[in-house]
């Protein structure tokens, strides 16, 4: 079989064409059955994968989301996933409990959350020791800007960031202790890890694309299994000019893993102690689930399906 004929078979195996095996057989002018061609194509793909590195993990990604500091989980549960290529933090690092619309019997100051969240991220990054850290924001992180918008004049708003993550990752911040008359500076993570060899990146958006996988933390929510992820898939198909093969959804505090068409849909669960978060008490909502996602990609950023998974912690 000629090289161009093999490429046609590989395109069918890799779902890059809608032609069926009968059409491909006729186009190639082969005198074999479509089933024989399909079986031969399996061997062609296995050999091509071996030669060109397909299905060989080039990039391993550990994605956690919904830490909701101070309700975060102990990062030592991630022991098996040390030294991954990328630690991806998919939003809602801090809870912004004091700024929420939910009724509360006590308040946790945003400054306390920022200080604790920053230290937790430092300890987490040192423990995992990834090559890169990529973080986007979530709906709880954006509460920061929403609170300022409701309570400050627009001129003052220009002095404020959108989320506390900008301060934690890029700008640093100061805590002015009015009681003790002290001022403490907290350096940003880009400075903390400047000489470590770990690349730190904060993406000022609710979504980030790594390879052909989207990691998203939208404001929208649907209660059905993978319904929010499916809605995100539809949005991304309308807006992403390039192809993608996976959507990893934060925000829902649910776990799920399925395919729709050629797109893998994952809901990764929450990396926080959901039993300590009392927002849903008495609302008869479905139980929250704790978990995280492992995403593996080949050298071209394509998803390696059999090595990508959701890890459920409860």
PLM ranges: what are they?
Residues 2-19:
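Short, amphipathic alpha-helical "recognition" segments used to contact nucleic acids or chromatin
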Residues 151-231, 270:
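Active-site-proximal loop/helix segment associated with metal-binding centers of metalloenzymes
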Residues 299-314:
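A short C-terminal boundary segment appended to hydrolase-like catalytic domains
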Residues 45-57:
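Short Lys/Arg-enriched helix C-cap and helix-to-coil transition segments
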Residues 2-5, 22-43:
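Short, basic interhelical loop/turn and adjoining N-cap
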Residues 219-303:
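Conserved beta-sheet core of the metallophosphoesterase superfamily
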Residues 64, 69-182, 186, 190:
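Core catalytic region of metal-dependent phosphoesterases/phosphodiesterases
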Residues 63-65, 86-92, 134-139, 215-218, ...:
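Active-site neighborhood of phospho(di)ester-bond hydrolases with catalytic His/Asp-centered motifs
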């Amino acid at each position: 079989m000629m090289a161009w004929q093999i490429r046609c078979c590989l395109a069918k195996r890799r779902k890059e064409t809608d032609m069926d095996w009968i059409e491909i057989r006729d186009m190639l002018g082969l005198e074999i059955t479509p089933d024989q061609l399909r079986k031969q194509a399996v061997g062609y793909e296995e050999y091509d994968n071996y030669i060109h590195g397909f299905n060989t993990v080039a990039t391993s990604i550990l994605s956690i989301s919904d830490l909701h500091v101070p309700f975060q989980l102990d990062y030592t549960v991630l022991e098996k996933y040390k030294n991954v290529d990328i630690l991806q933090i998919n939003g809602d690092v801090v809870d912004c409990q004091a700024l929420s619309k939910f009724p509360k019997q006590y308040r946790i100051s945003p400054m306390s959350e920022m200080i604790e969240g920053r230290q937790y991220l430092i300890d987490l990054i040192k423990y995992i020791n990834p090559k890169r850290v990529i973080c986007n924001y979530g709906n709880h992180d954006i509460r920061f800007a929403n609170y300022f918008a409701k309570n400050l004049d627009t001129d003052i708003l220009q002095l404020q960031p959108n989320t506390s993550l900008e301060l934690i990752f890029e700008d640093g911040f100061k805590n002015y202790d009015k009681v003790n008359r002290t001022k403490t500076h907290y350096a940003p993570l880009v400075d903390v890890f400047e000489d470590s060899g770990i690349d730190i990146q904060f993406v000022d958006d609710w979504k980030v694309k790594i390879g052909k996988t989207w990691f998203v933390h939208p404001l929208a929510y649907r209660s059905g299994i993978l319904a929010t992820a499916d809605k995100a898939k539809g949005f991304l198909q309308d807006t992403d000019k390039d192809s993608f093969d996976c959507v990893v959804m934060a925000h829902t505090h649910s776990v799920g893993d399925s395919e729709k068409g050629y797109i893998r849909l994952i809901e990764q669960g929450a990396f926080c102690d959901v039993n300590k978060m009392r927002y849903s008490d008495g609302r008869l909502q479905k139980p929250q689930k704790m978990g995280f996602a492992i995403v593996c990609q080949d050298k071209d950023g394509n998803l390696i399906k059999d090595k990508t998974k959701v890890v459920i912690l409860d």
